[in-house]
């Protein structure tokens, strides 16, 4: 169906307005007749009733009140076979008529029933039923003509910007394809993009008119949708974690990494940092903080984009099952995964649903908790058990009557105790030889997931502690021993130079020195109070040991009481000296000479008294 610019009726504030008086063409009478007959012209209805302030300009292009459909009586009977006016025939074709429809608008067919309903009831957005045409009184020819021009569904939202939904289908935002982050949440503004408008032009009739000078009415709507998404995310994840972003120069590229504010497992950060360093996931420039939900959405987007294109039917079904399992445990990435290592290889784990995430993302997962194959008794005791199986074996062996099983349980328990750091030198050697040069992977140790890489034959762990957020020279930490005392390096794996003393905060350094001295004094005091067990003979009886302990306790008590008496004597001497000094200060200024002579006589007496008090307060040990 085609229409002229004069027949446009913007639905603003719920009232359909027609062209202004005096602006009608020579065929205005024909338009009024067809409006009265129920053959409404095609009009463009905005998606929002409020608009952006330009609706008044469009409202001024209105028909006289007598020509308005609201004022036209409903004429029952058959409708006109003419679908509308032809712009080419009427000579009213304008350059704007050939343009594509504006974003935020779609074409509807106005009928007298719709116009009358719009007068009494406020029309909502384009998705409301009030803005939809009532085709009950139209003929089959008009239904056919209007069917090719109707929008897809109420609201007009789709998960794809360039592929609008076909007519009659209702796209769902809850589908798997709409799993996007907050910055790319599909809104009506993105759905009605220029690319989508170009794709929709061939579907509509040529010469379709648009509002000249109109502006898309989707900015306010997009802000409202974003606010709704943020409110929904807060309800879904109350008290969610917020992470700070550190920007580094990684291979001459300004690359972000996610830092961790609390010490915990959080495999989500390790996985996202691998994807960020590989430039498979990109964040907005100079972004400083990000929420856990946003990280999950970025990860979900990447998992959907990484779906293989050409696979067989069996592989597709297997991939979909793995994707479903991964989505089910995706929320665990914020707190921790159930990873069960085996002590036979750096990439050998007991298969759990949590491992599917690493398989789908194609991120290697390593550990270094291996048994040295040269120690036969440990190899026999541990065998091919995983960590959980080994713990169960130790418990069962301890309760067994077989001495050999008890011995194996004891050896296995000793192995776990001696390798509490969950990294052995044999495992470190295997890691160094297995990890490829420049490979980005995840390293599991002590229930913690770290981003790891290999540079010139040396393993490095990414430093994600938030305390180093502003330290540009601290990016990687070398992994060259099992004690965890690696060296800090910058983004180019250069050792961190020592800090300039002038740049060190003096107050902070003084506090560190005081804390160190306090700890040292406490350590010395504790060592002085401890009993030297090496000096006690091995054959001593319990009675003699008790006597020695009692003597040590008596010595400590006497030392404590001596310190208390000395402190009390010093306090008494100080108070006496203060009382004697007050009369001397209260002497009149007129008798300065006599006062000075008296003070000179009193000074040796006071010194003698203090010496006598010190002698009396001394305790002979």
Swiss-Prot record:
Pfam families: MINDY_DUB (PF04424)
Chemical reaction(s) catalysed: Thiol-dependent hydrolysis of ester, thioester, amide, peptide and isopeptide bonds formed by the C-terminal Gly of ubiquitin (a 76-residue protein attached to proteins as an intracellular targeting signal)
A cellular component term, taken from the record's GO annotations: nucleoplasm
Annotated region described as Ubiquitin-binding domain (UBD), given as residue ranges: 507-559
E.C. numbers: 3.4.19.12
Active site: 266 (nucleophile), 448 (proton acceptor)
Residues under site feature: Ubiquitin-binding: 542, 545-546, 549
One of the record's GO molecular function terms: cysteine-type deubiquitinase activity
Keywords recorded for this protein, A-Z: Hydrolase, Phosphoprotein, Protease, Thiol protease, Ubl conjugation pathway
Class of enzymatic activity (EC top level): hydrolase
InterPro entries: MINDY, MINDY_domain
Database matches in PANTHER family: NF-E2 INDUCIBLE PROTEIN, UBIQUITIN CARBOXYL-TERMINAL HYDROLASE MINDY-2
Entry protein name: Ubiquitin carboxyl-terminal hydrolase MINDY-2
Amino acid composition bias (Low complexity), ranges on this chain: 145-163, 558-591
GO annotation, biological process: proteolysis
Family: Belongs to the MINDY deubiquitinase family. FAM63 subfamily.
Protein's job: Hydrolase that can remove 'Lys-48'-linked conjugated ubiquitin from proteins. Binds to polyubiquitin chains of different linkage types, including 'Lys-6', 'Lys-11', 'Lys-29', 'Lys-33', 'Lys-48' and 'Lys-63'. May play a regulatory role at the level of protein turnover.
Modified residues (Phosphoserine): 94
Record lineage: Eukaryota, Metazoa, Chordata, Craniata, Vertebrata
Residue stretches of biased makeup (Basic and acidic residues): 597-621
Residue ranges, annotated region (Disordered): 1-106, 119-179, 556-621
Keyword Zinc set for record: no
């Amino acid at each position: 169906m085609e229409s002229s610019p004069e027949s446009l009726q913007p639905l603003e504030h719920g009232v359909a307005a027609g062209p202004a008086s005096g602006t009608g063409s020579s065929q205005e009478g024909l338009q009024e007749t067809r409006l009265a007959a129920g053959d409404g012209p095609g009009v463009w209805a905005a998606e929002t009733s409020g608009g952006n302030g330009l609706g008044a300009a469009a409202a001024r292009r209105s028909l006289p009140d007598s020509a308005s459909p609201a004022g036209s009586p409903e004429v029952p009977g058959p409708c006109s076979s003419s679908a509308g006016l032809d712009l080419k025939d009427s000579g009213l074709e304008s350059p704007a008529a050939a343009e594509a429809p504006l974003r935020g608008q779609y074409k509807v067919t106005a009928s007298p029933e719709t116009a009358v309903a719009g007068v009494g009831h406020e029309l909502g957005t384009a998705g409301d039923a009030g803005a939809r045409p009532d085709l009950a009184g139209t003929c089959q020819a008009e239904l056919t003509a209007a069917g090719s021009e109707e929008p897809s569904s109420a609201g007009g939202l789709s998960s794809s910007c360039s592929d609008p939904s076909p007519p009659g289908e209702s796209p769902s935002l809850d589908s798997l394809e709409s799993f996007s982050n907050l910055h790319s949440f599909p809104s009506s503004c993105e759905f009605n993009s220029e690319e989508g408008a170009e794709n929709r032009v061939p579907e509509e009739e040529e010469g379709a008119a648009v509002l000249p000078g109109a502006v898309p009415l989707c900015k306010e709507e997009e802000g409202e949708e974003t606010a709704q998404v943020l409110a929904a995310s807060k309800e879904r994840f109350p008290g969610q974690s917020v992470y700070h972003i550190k920007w580094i120069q990684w291979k001459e590229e300004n690359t972000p990494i996610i830092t961790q504010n609390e010490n915990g497992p959080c495999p989500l950060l390790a996985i996202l940092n691998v994807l960020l360093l590989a430039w498979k996931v990109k964040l907005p420039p100079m972004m400083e903080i990000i929420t856990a939900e946003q990280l999950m959405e970025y990860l979900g987007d990447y998992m959907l984009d990484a779906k293989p294109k050409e696979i067989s039917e069996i592989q597709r079904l297997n991939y979909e099952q793995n994707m479903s399992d991964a989505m089910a445990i995706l929320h665990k990435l914020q707190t921790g995964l159930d990873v069960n290592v085996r002590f036979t290889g750096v990439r050998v784990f007991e298969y759990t649903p949590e491992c599917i995430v690493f398989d789908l993302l194609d991120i290697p997962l390593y550990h270094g908790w291996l048994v040295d194959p040269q120690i036969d008794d440990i190899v026999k005791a541990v065998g091919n058990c995983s960590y959980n199986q080994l713990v169960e074996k130790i418990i069962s062996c301890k309760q067994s009557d077989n001495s050999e099983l008890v011995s194996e349980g004891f050896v296995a328990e000793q192995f776990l105790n001696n390798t509490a750091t969950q990294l052995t030198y044999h495992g470190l050697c295997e890691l160094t030889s297995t990890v490829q040069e420049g490979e980005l992977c995840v390293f599991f140790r002590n229930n913690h997931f770290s981003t790891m890489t290999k540079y010139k034959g040396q393993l490095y762990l990414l430093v994600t502690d938030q305390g180093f957020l502003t330290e540009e020279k601290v990016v990687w930490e070398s992994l060259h021993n099992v004690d965890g005392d690696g060296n800090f390096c910058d983004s180019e794996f250069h050792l961190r130079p020592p800090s300039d003393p002038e740049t060190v905060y003096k107050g902070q350094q003084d506090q560190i020195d005081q804390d160190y001295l306090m700890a040292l004094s406490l350590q010395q005091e504790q060592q002085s109070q401890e009993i030297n067990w090496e000096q006690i003979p091995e054959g001593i009886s319990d009675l003699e040991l008790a006597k020695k302990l009692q003597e040590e306790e008596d010595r400590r008590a006497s030392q404590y009481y001596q310190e208390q008496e000395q402190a009390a004597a010093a306090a008494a001497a100080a108070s006496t000296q203060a009382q004697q000094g007050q009369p001397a200060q209260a002497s009149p200024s007129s008798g300065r000479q006599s006062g000075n002579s008296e003070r000179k006589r009193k000074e040796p007496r006071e010194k003698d008294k203090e010496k006598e008090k010190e002698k009396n307060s001394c305790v002979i040990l």
